[in-house]
UniProtKB/Swiss-Prot annotation:
UniProt protein name: Large ribosomal subunit protein uL11
PANTHER family named in the record: 60S RIBOSOMAL PROTEIN L12, LARGE RIBOSOMAL SUBUNIT PROTEIN UL11M
Function: Forms part of the ribosomal stalk which helps the ribosome interact with GTP-bound translation factors.
Species assigned in the record: Histophilus somni (strain 2336)
Pfam family, one: Ribosomal_L11_N
An annotated GO cellular component: cytosolic large ribosomal subunit
A single GO BP: translation
Stored NCBIfam families: L11_bact
Alphabetical UniProt keywords: Methylation, Ribonucleoprotein, Ribosomal protein, RNA-binding, rRNA-binding
Amino acid sequence: MAKKVQAYVKLQVAAGMANPSPPVGPALGQQGVNIMEFCKAFNARTESLEKGLPIPVVITVYADRSFTFVTKTPPAAVLLKKAAGIKSGSSKPNKDKVGKVTLDQIRQIAETKAADMTGATIETKMKSIEGTARSMGLVVEG
């Protein structure tokens, strides 16, 4: 018989840097989950990724207080900022352009995020990433 699901907890945690402080501690503590067990498992799973990169994670908490979790790919905005070499997007994206990205960089990001995105082809996923880039004030070249 399958375990009874008590809750789903969605968080963004820095790769390799999960610790019991907020946001992890309070979110898991109120569900009765062993926080250190999650932190060790998460850090082990994300040790191959760039340290500090925000990773979305969905934690399934069961009635017996056990848990499983699924890590996703980093948000497109984070990958775009890294590709363009900027700290943050534009506050006025239609007027102020803060950087440039090429179609090759967008294709690479779309391929990285392919598993977490909807869209039949890589081209449709690229269009989605291009839209995110434009809304951040980035110029798409190519």
